[in-house]
């Protein structure tokens, strides 16, 4: 398992050669807020590494998904403390306690429970980082290491651990600054935040094409 994960990470690092410049923005969210598109273009990263990535084995990040509740981009502050803020991820509503699955094989580089993100995990997959927020559980230490512990859910995830795509890494909770049970899912490519919805669309297109191709053979 460890050898396969390392090989996959190496392939993902090479995928940056296929960087594709996309002009699509979170227009639905921006339109709902009535914000100027030119302001969004100036501040919202719009480079997404889509070409060259093989996401046929990637996983949707939450079980019992109900709805997308807040898109990537500018929005009104959910708690009313700001007129607008930049939302660095995609919120996915699911019943509290629903399991969260790792999107893509990688290594856990950070576990935390002391920010607005609540109990959270950051996983590195080549040039990609995926961030999971508002999870159940807390961060504990043992033998000089740190890990996310959710005993009720049977989850124990250590910093430095290799995690395959689709593995259960936590559960939807209400830690941090949530307005209801949901997963906040953030994505970075080469240290820049990108719109997770764009990546999901590319992933679904690849997976649908793979299914059609296998049926035709």
Describe the role of every protein-language-model region.
Residues 133, 195-197:
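Catalytic Cys-His active-site segments of thiol-dependent hydrolases/isopeptidases
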Residues 95, 101-102, 111, 128-166:
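Short histidine-centered loop motifs in beta-beta connectors
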Residues 183-191:
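A short hydrophobic beta-strand segment most commonly corresponding to one strand
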Residues 35-120, 125-126, 138, 165, ...:
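Surface-exposed, glycine-biased beta-strand/turn segments
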Residues 127-128, 191:
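Glycine-centered tight beta-turn/hairpin loop motif at sheet-sheet or coil-to-beta transitions
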Residues 1-51, 215-217:
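N-terminal secretion targeting segments of exported proteins
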């Amino acid at each position: 398992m460890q050898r396969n994960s390392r090989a996959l990470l190496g392939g993902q690092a090479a995928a940056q050669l296929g960087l594709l410049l996309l002009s699509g923005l979170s227009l639905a969210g921006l339109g709902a807020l009535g914000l100027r598109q030119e302001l969004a273009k100036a501040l919202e990263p719009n480079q997404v590494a889509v070409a060259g990535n093989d996401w046929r084995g990637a996983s949707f990040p939450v079980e019992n998904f109900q709805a997308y509740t807040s898109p990537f981009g500018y929005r009104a502050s959910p708690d009313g403390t700001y007129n607008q803020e930049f939302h660095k991820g995609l919120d996915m509503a699911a019943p509290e306690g629903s399991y969260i699955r790792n999107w893509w094989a990688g290594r856990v580089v950070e576990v935390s429970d002391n920010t607005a993100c609540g109990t959270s995990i950051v996983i590195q997959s080549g040039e990609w980082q995926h961030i999971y927020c508002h999870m159940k559980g807390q961060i504990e230490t043992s033998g000089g290491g740190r890990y996310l512990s959710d005993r009720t859910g049977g989850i124990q995830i250590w910093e430095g651990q290799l995690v395959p795509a689709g593995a259960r890494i936590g559960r939807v909770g209400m830690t941090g600054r949530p307005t209801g049970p949901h997963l906040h899912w953030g994505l970075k490519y080469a240290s820049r935040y990108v719109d997770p919805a764009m990546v999901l669309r590319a992933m679904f297109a690849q997976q649908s094409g793979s299914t059609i191709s296998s049926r035709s053979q």
